[in-house]
């Protein structure tokens, strides 16, 4: 009888010692950290966006790829600083990354591949400054039409 209790406790203790499955947000953090450990990376990169965005309904096991965008920060890559406290570098590099999700024994094995982003994070021209130009052009056209019609 004692051996049954010992066996039961050993099984329960072993089950409790198993690592918790990796969540989507944790996998993204692990992928960014993996990229930052590369020898060619001087300044650390931080997560800019992910597709899909992290949320309670996103399960890592349902994804085939992690797709995310990272941006260069002002912190050194191997300084040990918390990435959340690092500010993005003005005109810093932006990279689009992908990592196939391979689950082995409840752990994710990530092979991160990043390329320079084609999206330019600098300011874009806005529509509103062009409105006065358009109004003046239309008004000049109307005045020209009226002048021609009078003749």
UniProtKB/Swiss-Prot annotation:
GO biological process: antimicrobial humoral immune response mediated by antimicrobial peptide; defense response to Gram-negative bacterium; defense response to Gram-positive bacterium; innate immune response
Signal sequence segment: 1-17
InterPro entries, per database record: Cathelicidin-like (IPR001894), Cystatin_sf (IPR046350)
Molecular function via GO: lipopolysaccharide binding; membrane destabilizing activity
Annotated keywords: Antibiotic, Antimicrobial, Disulfide bond, Immunity, Innate immunity, Membrane, Secreted, Signal, Transmembrane, Transmembrane helix
Role played: May bind bacterial lipopolysaccharide (LPS). May have antimicrobial activity and play a role in the innate immune response.
Protein name: Cathelicidin-3
Taxonomic source organism: Gallus gallus
